[in-house]
Each structure stands twice: as C-alpha cells, then as structure tokens.
Amino acid sequence: MTFELKHRDRSHLSHHFNAILGNPPVEWKISDHLVEYPEALRYMQERVEKILAKTAHEQVWLLEHPSLYTAGTSADKKDLLAPHLFPVYEAGRGGEFTYHGPGQRIAYIMLDLKRRKQDIRAFISALEEWIIQMLASFNIKGERREDRVGVWVKQSHCPSKKNDLSSEDKIAAIGIRVRKWISFHGVSINVNPNLAHYSGIVPCGITNHGVTSFLNLGCPVTMHDIDIALKHAFEKIFGPTIDVS
C-alpha cells in the first residue's frame, strides 16, 4: 500500500518507534557513489521480500542519486514542467513529483512495522521528528505542517530572506510505501543540491512554498556531518543500528 497523508493532526502522536525486545539492530548502509534510481528501486524491493522472509534484517540506506525526477502515486502530469530536463521515473511511493540529485542525502527506510508499531500516520510523524532532531543539531529549526508532509524551515533562518518572516520552504521530503507492513522509500534532505533543478517540476504539487537547503540557509556542512547527525537522531527514535557495507 502507498500512503497519502491528508489534513489530519499528527503532532500528538508518539515519536518513539523502538522495535520489540530482541530485535536485531537496524543495518546502517552508506553508499559513497551516485546510485542509479532503477538500481535503488530494485534493491529496496528485493530487501523488502527478504525482510518478509526473515532472511534479512531491517536497514537504512544512505545514498545520493544522479539528477532525476520521480513521480509518486498522486503525481499530476501538469506538475512536470520540463519533462526532458532529467530522466523521470515512476516511484510507486506516496506523494507527487520530486527531484533527486547530487548534494541531496537520500535515506531509504526498510523497517518492519509489525515489530514496532502498525500505525502509518505515527510512522510518518516519527520520520519527521527524526529530521527535526537532526536539523536541531545544526541549530536549524525544522517544523512539521499538518496540511503537508515533510519538514519545513521558516525563511527568517535564511540570510537572503531574513526580512520575509512569512515565507517557509521545504528542506526535507518524505515519501514512503508499505508492503505487508514493511516500509521502503523514505526521506530526502537538501544538503547542497542545485536548487534550480527543482524548476522542472512543481515539487510535491505545492505552488505557494519553495525548497531550501543547508547551504541556502548559510550552513555549509559535509555529507559526513549529516550522516553522523542522522544516525544519532535515528537511534533515539528507532533504536540501535549497526554499520554494514
């Protein structure tokens, strides 16, 4: 099943998604090269089947993609403004169009919600909280919005928009799919991508807000810095991890 979150309050939901006692640590995998989207999609689908068969453990996979657009299950063709700019892939996840590319940290989340909590709204909220806590470690205040999924930053944080107190932009997008209570797809975090590449789509179907990045906020960080902060915040919400290659 794919998941679409509509206008429903989730701020009160528990953000703790620890597994049942005795569950192995979540594997923490980092790829240091650009991963083609079809390869990543194939890997996730195979991993989900292995988790279902109990022949593989849960995993978080951190990576970057070459520049591309993906279409979620709610994508509207009119929101693809420049169809020939980059390759376009049907993702099968919830959501609409989004951009992936170098300088963006992708975290694919393959967790067994039966071992944790069979509540997809709470899972989305926990993913948002994970990103919010990660951002806080860099003194960036990320916020959730009840009418749209993802993590948002008020542009009073951005040096170029300090006088625009009403503006807010998305720094992290979330799009998941769940198959027999195993999650896949995940989150994308703008570290230092070329934000102009978003001009070929209406990101997530939202026209009245933009996108931002760590670099755009005046916070130049390395991908390694992001990975350390992500791991620390993840373990507080989802439990222990173990590094794998």
Curated annotation (Swiss-Prot):
GO cellular component, one term: cytoplasm
Protein name: Octanoyltransferase
Name of the coding gene: lipB
Biological process annotations from GO: protein modification process
InterPro entries linked: aa-tRNA-synth_II/BPL/LPL, BPL_LPL_catalytic, Octanoyltransferase, Octanoyltransferase_CS
Keywords: Acyltransferase, Cytoplasm, Transferase
Site for Lowers pKa of active site Cys, residues: 170
Family classification: Belongs to the LipB family.
Catalytic activity: octanoyl-[ACP] + L-lysyl-[protein] = N(6)-octanoyl-L-lysyl-[protein] + holo-[ACP] + H(+)
Domain BPL/LPL catalytic: residue ranges: 54-242
Top-level lineage group: Bacteria
Disulfide-bond pairs as recorded: none
HAMAP family: LipB
Organism: Bartonella tribocorum (strain CIP 105476 / IBS 506)
Pathway given in the UniProt record: Protein modification; protein lipoylation via endogenous pathway; protein N(6)-(lipoyl)lysine from octanoyl-[acyl-carrier-protein]: step 1/2
EC number annotated for this UniProt entry: 2.3.1.181
Pfam families (UniProt xref): LplA-B_cat
EC class: transferase
NCBIfam families: lipB, PRK14341.1, PRK14345.1
Presence of the UniProt keyword Cell division in the record: no
SUPFAM superfamilies for the chain: Class II aaRS and biotin synthetases
Miscellaneous remark of the record: In the reaction, the free carboxyl group of octanoic acid is attached via an amide linkage to the epsilon-amino group of a specific lysine residue of lipoyl domains of lipoate-dependent enzymes.
Function: Catalyzes the transfer of endogenously produced octanoic acid from octanoyl-acyl-carrier-protein onto the lipoyl domains of lipoate-dependent enzymes. Lipoyl-ACP can also act as a substrate although octanoyl-ACP is likely to be the physiological substrate.
Catalytic residue list: 204 (acyl-thioester intermediate)
Residue positions binding substrate: 93-100, 173-175, 186-188
